[in-house]
Amino acid sequence: MRRLAFALLVPFALWGSYASADYRITRDHGGLVDQYKVKYVSIRDRGERVVIDGICNSACTLVLGIVPLNRICVTPRASLGFHMAYFDKSTTGGLKVMSYEGTADVMSYYPNTVKDWLSRHGGLTPDMKKVRNGPELWAIIDPCPDEIF
């Protein structure tokens, strides 16, 4: 009887640990790298979990290099988008000017799974490179348990 009770409780315990994910990304197109660093360091330091449940482009992808990968998962709706860093347009007269130093900085945060994927797809370029749900995304980050979505 005790085994049965334990067996019935385990799925609920696991569900609770993921269902109440502390931070859910659903539609994030990125922004200023330094602001994302501060946000994700804070999430990491509080021990929060992250569920990528939609678009995570540009600076949003820094989450993969700042929050431990074992505290991040992706749902079937997740997609990641990567491109070279560029200077804030407010400082360049509205022009999109690539930042090689910024790109190197962003790359230094990414885990090997991201670096490997980018290497196989030509590295960071001015154009957005997307990876969507499926084996390529799962090679970068684990899928979430079914219970969370």
Range-by-range predicted roles:
Residues 14-22:
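Sec/Tat signal peptide C-region and signal peptidase I cleavage site
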Residues 79-84, 101-105:
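Short, basic, helix/turn surface patches
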Residues 7-14:
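Bacterial N-terminal signal peptides
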Residues 22-78, 84-88:
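Cleft-lining beta-strand/loop regions that shape enzyme active-site pockets
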Residues 23-25, 34, 38-51, 91-149:
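Charged, glycine-interspersed solvent-exposed loop segments at helix/strand-loop junctions
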Residues 1-6:
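Bacterial N-terminal signal peptides that target proteins for export
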